[in-house]
Amino acid sequence: MARQPHILHLNWSASNAELLRNGARNDCTAVGNQNSNDLFRFTRGRFLSDESRHLSKRYVQFEIDELARLAVRAAETASQGSRRCVNTEKLPDGMHNKVVRFTMDDGSQIVGKVPNPNAGKANFTTASEVATMDFLRNVMKIPIPNVLAWSSTSENELWDKLEVNVKFKVLRNIAFYQEAWLHTTFSHYGSLYYKNDVGLSTPSVEYTDKAGVTIVDDRFTIGPSVSRQNTDDGRLEMDFDRGPWTTAADYERATGLREIYCTENMPKLPRSPIALHYSGTYQPSRESKILAIESYLKLLRYLLPEVSIQTSHIWHCDLHAENIFVNPSNLSEIYGIIDWQSTELAPLYDHPIEPYILEYDGPPLDGLLDRPKLADIRSLFQGDPEPLAERKATSLYTKMSLVSLYRHLVHKKMPLLFKALEFRETLCFQLLLFTRNLLVDGEATYLALLADQQQNNWKDIPKLNHTDEKFPLVFSAEMLRQIERDHIGATSSMELMREIQEMIGPKYFYARGVVTHDEYNEVSQIIPRAKKEFIRKYARDEGEIAELESAWPFD
């Protein structure tokens, strides 16, 4: 969460460059303050695993002078004084974008965002984000500002410093915007675009507002999904159905077909980030992944929730502190919500309903509407000395109380959204959710869940448990034994990865395998020792030494 600065948000795309080549004034003097190659590469930190691949996916060259000229034009629109760019500065990288700040001669600032190759298909990513922001700001009246700031570490700590009553007011304001998203439903599932970006022959967007009125807006259309699940882990280069779709069932079926297509056609399966696989544990195969995905497709119609929460909605799926701007004079007032890249029109139940700003490392509440008990939480820290134990208990109690308050607010104000929240707690939703990443990992666990359901008469899948129909999926006795063996091996693989991370140090794995440059200098001394110790512990012969050398996940 950050206090809002007075700067503009500028997206860079190929169409911007074309506009500049065809007549924009060359009246910007950009003063670079760093190595030009640093503008193009990822400099925020280092990757612990497969660094060269991660860096290549985040390297993008662009014309900084062209972007600066466009920044001047944007500044002129917002201010009568800006005529010249006097400084450029690259801000800390996002995981999917480069961000450059341009300072004008009148002190105003423009922030330009350039998508990395891993952000999505070049001809769709920016087009969809801009159209989405336009629709949200001008049709739904959501505060999508003409501003973008990169929040530094100190600014990101603002949420933690707020009083509890202020935090709840922020959550109440977030719920207000969620209510607007809830009451706007779309005819299709996919992503928003301007019609002239994807072809004027495409149908105009059709949506239903809070009053139940169906509206057709000729400026927009619904096209292919730009969701991260369609681009990550090599999927970006694959040719599969990205939508749009007309039903939630079609949307979910496309997920399974995508995972099968990628599993069958990728030259090499992606390496799991959560498990270490070798012959001593479990080794993934295309066959086991396809079995899991085909099983999902057979069960799909039994997994879907009731129709009322299958409707298509726009949603912000990453409401963490960096994406919420507040009024410096009134910290509970939300000025704007940013980062709508990869926004998808998806089924209501599919969207993350509880804002990520509520996430915490602690025990789950027993039920969605249960309230935490301070005495129970204090018991978790009995082994810690005072006053540390009391501080930990109070902090955890506060975080759990905010989750409880938010859930009660949703239950009271938005019962349909609460129904979606309830569905997200079920096995049916977990089976829908886990399918989205079976290309990468999880097939052994997925099949074990299905095997357990078969052996227990599908007790957690109500549509199967209460039907006289023939079960669509039946594993043989031999297959059940193989699934159990694979599950045990896969569990061991995950335990080995956790052990490796403990040996190296948990503090280096808090941010998706990205560390600061100083941390990298530290951990690069630790990793070789941990690797040597790990292989000595688990390798039983020369063959396994070679295997574990090859399987070792960290550079």
Predicted regions and their residues:
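Conserved NTP-binding catalytic cores of kinases and kinase-like/nucleotidyltransferase enzymes
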Residues: 2-156, 163, 176-179, 187, ...
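Catalytic activation segment of kinase domains across protein kinase-like and atypical kinase folds
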Residues: 194, 202-219, 313-315, 320-383
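ATP-binding pocket architecture of kinase catalytic cores
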Residues: 86-294, 302-314, 332-333
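Residues that cap or delimit alpha-helices
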Residues: 12-16, 24-32, 44, 163, ...
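Active-site acidic catalytic loop and adjacent metal/ATP-binding pocket
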Residues: 98-101, 112, 295-350, 543, ...
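C-terminal subdomain of alpha/beta-hydrolase-fold enzymes, centered on the catalytic histidine
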Residues: 320, 332, 341, 441, ...
